[in-house]
Swiss-Prot record:
UniProt-listed Pfam families: Flu_PA
Extent of the signal sequence: none
InterPro entries: INFV_PA (IPR037534), PA/PA-X (IPR001009), PA/PA-X_sf (IPR038372)
Assembly notes: Influenza RNA polymerase is composed of three subunits: PB1, PB2 and PA. Interacts (via C-terminus) with PB1 (via N-terminus).
Record-linked HAMAP family: INFV_PA
Phylogenetic placement of the source organism: Viruses, Riboviria, Orthornavirae, Negarnaviricota, Polyploviricotina
Recorded GO CC terms: host cell cytoplasm; host cell nucleus
E.C. code: 3.1.-.-
Alphabetically ordered keywords of this record: Cap snatching, Endonuclease, Eukaryotic host gene expression shutoff by virus, Eukaryotic host transcription shutoff by virus, Host cytoplasm, Host gene expression shutoff by virus, Host nucleus, Host-virus interaction, Hydrolase, Inhibition of host RNA polymerase II by virus, Manganese, Metal-binding, Nuclease, Phosphoprotein
Binding site for Mn(2+) 1: H41, D108, E119, I120
Cofactor, free-text remark: Binds 2 manganese ions per subunit.
Protein name: Polymerase acidic protein
Record localization: Host cytoplasm; Host nucleus
Length: 716
């Protein structure tokens, strides 16, 4: 087939087809039928355009012999055969000069006489089938479709064939000749059978046997067989009268569509109750680090060695005591656990060689804190069949909690800049394609905006803690292992820094299933006095463990150092996602990228540089009771990142539900702002679905309060 193509077609056409296949990563040595099809399509496009001109009077004429004196303009602009970037440039230019609507897919030609884009099709199947596939894919009134077949048939939109009879006959004759030549060489059958439909059409394959019975059983109400349902779906017009559509779907439905006006929506009702509490797996804005710069000690990089080195930098330790007890816990056990950690670290230092990991003694306080022997005994269900009153144990409804100001403060803090660099610029090879150059430029600009951000610190801290905990859970299942909470960064001057936030002690961890829980006790340093916001620290027992000297503008001052201790738990699946928190960087980069793309398509050039370097321009960041908050592009990057990070830190079923349900209301409000006159039914049910997710989660409650601010300002 390849030899035939090279003999049969003009070398320029062959070269263009080779380029097209290379652009899509296809091998013409393997996909020979596709190679022939591309050449055929190119030739038909060129023949369609050949000899057709517009004269000075604006009339369409056919000129076969070049008359050098005639001032003629080509009637057709050829788009097919150009590389994608150039082709879109031509399309944009035509749209700008003629006012034509921009097509979704690249067409083949533009007709200056009839002012429309043309899609040419060449098919080895029936023309009407191919025509319908094309029309289904393009879904545009403005692109004219013209299909030719190898049997001399043709079909065009509204039977408007654009060209004169003779020009079309020339194309049909050429296609017939190609078919004959292929048949003579025994290539036609393979070529005819290799044609695939447009990718948007699903093949109709027959379903038989069990699958057929299951399909018939699982139809929506009022459909008696699969064909009946298929016919309904195929004939469903999406933009008809909604009430009619609903009544078609089920006899039970009699929804009345209510107009959605500015006065329709009410604010989301947030729950009353005691203030919500901190539930993240580690401290955020309240965390305190003991740090070493330019670490070069023996065993540097081994967590336990690093932790001991960091602990040695602090000299203000004192006899610990409880300043804020945990309401329901045995607080003396938390105190004893910290004393045990200090004592066992001291024992390590007295040893000749420091071990790589530390297994804690199974003392009564740690057994209590880690819930050892607390789980009810599991009994095989087979042994319980005869028990008459077997039932699942009752679980209490969660207590409703109200929004508290601390979660907004946490979010604001996450958007701020620190004086350290938390991520390095990725070392990626040289750019080879223009798109890679733009992508790496965007990535570098974005990295510069977020590398110092506190949310990025939380990412690196989360990745480290979850990785260390999952490793220990698998490697030392029965041990109470001591895991330092460590992060690494660079100072502004580029010096390496190792930070210790505190310690975790892991309980027994025979994790068979993804959701099996491993208990752990976290002990984290802080300078925050828990008595200022006791409701935030409901789940913690807080000790005072030392005094820290801090340098300030007025000289040195001493501040008490606290230790926040709590029992917590996590699972394999949660640790797996925690290890992948770097994805948050990617998600927020993609959101920024879509903003740049929107700007670039308006200006019709890449706006990355202007977007990041125009410091005077402000962008919307979010809603507050004061109105739409605006800030620099850097602030937008950091806010989007912080949102993504908090979605990971505070992930919960409440958040999933609230996000999914509130999005529906958001879309309706946006439709109202765009003057699309939206209608709704059962708006009360939607509010119910949103509000049942507002129970006690601080991040969900904050998002709901932001949503209310949005409603207020969007509907003014």
């Amino acid at each position: 087939m390849e030899d035939f193509v090279r003999q049969c077609f003009n070398p320029m056409i062959v070269e263009l087809a080779e380029k097209a296949m290379k652009e899509y990563g296809e091998d013409l040595k393997i996909e020979t039928n596709k190679f022939a099809a591309i050449c055929t399509h190119l030739e038909v496009c060129f023949m369609y355009s050949d000899f057709h001109f517009i004269n000075e009077q604006g009339e369409s004429i056919v000129v076969e012999l070049d008359d050098p004196n005639a001032l003629l303009k080509h009637r057709f602009e050829i788009i097919e055969g150009r590389d994608r970037t150039m082709a879109w440039t031509v399309v944009n230019s035509i749209c700008n000069t003629t006012g034509a609507e921009k097509p979704k897919f690249l067409p083949d030609l533009y007709d200056y006489k009839k002012n429309r884009f043309i899609e040419i099709g060449v098919t080895r199947r029936e023309v009407h089938i191919y025509y319908l596939e094309k029309a289904n894919k393009i879904k545009s009134e403005n692109t004219h479709i013209h299909i030719f077949s190898f049997t001399g048939e043709e079909m065009a939109t509204k039977a408007d064939y654009t060209l004169d009879e003779e020009s079309r006959a020339r194309i049909k004759t050429r296609l017939f000749t190609i078919r004959q030549e292929m048949a003579n060489r025994g290539l036609w059958d393979s070529f005819r059978q290799s044609e695939r439909g447009e990718e948007t059409i699903e093949e109709r394959f027959e379903i038989t046997g069990t699958m057929r019975r299951l399909a018939d059983q699982s139809l929506p109400p009022n459909f008696f067989c699969l064909e009946n349902f298929r016919a309904y779906v195929d004939g469903f017009e999406p933009n008809g009268c909604i009430e009619g559509k609903l009544s078609q779907m089920s006899k039970e439905v009699n929804a009345k569509i209510e107009p959605f006006l500015k006065t329709t929506p009410r604010p989301i009702k947030l729950p009353d109750g005691p203030p919500c509490f901190q539930r993240s797996k580690f401290l955020l804005m309240d965390a305190l680090k003991l740090s070493i710069e330019d670490p070069s000690h023996e065993g540097e990089g081994i967590p336990l060695y690093d932790a001991i080195k960091c602990m040695r930098t602090f000299f203000g330790w004192k006899e610990p005591y409880i300043v804020k007890p945990h309401e329901r816990g045995i607080n003396s056990n938390y105190l004893q656990s910290w004393k045990q950690v200090l004592a066992e670290l001291q024992d390590i230092e007295n040893e000749e060689k420091i071990p790589r990991t530390k297994t804690m003694k199974k003392t009564s306080q740690l057994k209590w804190a880690l819930g050892e022997n607390m789980a009810p005994e599991k009994v095989d269900f087979e042994n319980c069949r005869d028990i008459s009153d077997l039932k699942q144990y009752d679980s209490d409804e969660p207590e409703l909690r109200s929004l508290s100001s601390w979660i907004q403060n946490e979010f604001n803090k996450a958007c701020e800049l620190t004086d350290s660099i938390w991520i390095e610029l990725d070392e990626i090879g040289e750019d080879v394609a223009p798109i890679e150059y733009i992508a790496s430029m965007r990535r570098n600009y974005f990295t510069a905006e977020v590398s110092h951000c506190r949310a990025t610190e939380y990412i690196m801290k989360g990745v480290y803690i979850n990785t260390a905990l999952l490793n220990a859970s698998c490697a030392a299942m029965d041990d109470f292992q001591l895991i330092p909470m460590i992060s690494k960064c660079r100072t502004k001057e580029g010096r390496r820094k190792t930070n210790l936030y505190g310690f975790i002690i892991k309980g027994r961890s025979h994790l068979r299933n993804d959701t099996d829980v491993v208990n752990f006790v976290s002990m984290e340093f802080s300078l925050t006095d828990p008595r200022l916001e006791p409701h935030k620290w409901e789940k913690y027992c807080v000790l005072e463990i030392g005094d820290m000297l801090l340098r300030s503008a007025i000289g040195q001052m001493s501040r008490p150092m606290f230790l926040y201790v709590r029992t917590n738990g996590t699972s394999k699946i949660k640790m797996k996602w925690g290890m992948e928190m770097r994805r948050c960087l990617l998600q927020s980069l993609q959101q920024i990228e879509s903003m740049i793309e929107a700007e670039s398509s308006v200006k019709e050039k890449d706006m990355t540089k202007e977007f990041f370097e125009n410091k005077s321009e402000t962008w919307p960041i979010g809603e507050s009771p004061k109105g739409v908050e605006e800030g620099s592009i850097g602030k937008v990057c950091r806010t989007l990142l912080a949102k993504s990070v908090f979605n990971s830190l505070y992930a919960s079923p409440q958040l999933e539900g609230f996000s999914a349900e509130s999005r529906k209301l958001l879309l309706v409000v946006q439709a109202l702002r765009d003057n699309l006159e939206p209608g709704t039914f059962d708006l009360g049910g939607l509010y119910e679905a949103i509000e049942e997710c507002l129970i006690n989660d601080p991040w969900v409650l904050l998002n709901a309060s932001w949503f209310n601010s949005f409603l207020t300002h969007a509907l003014k």
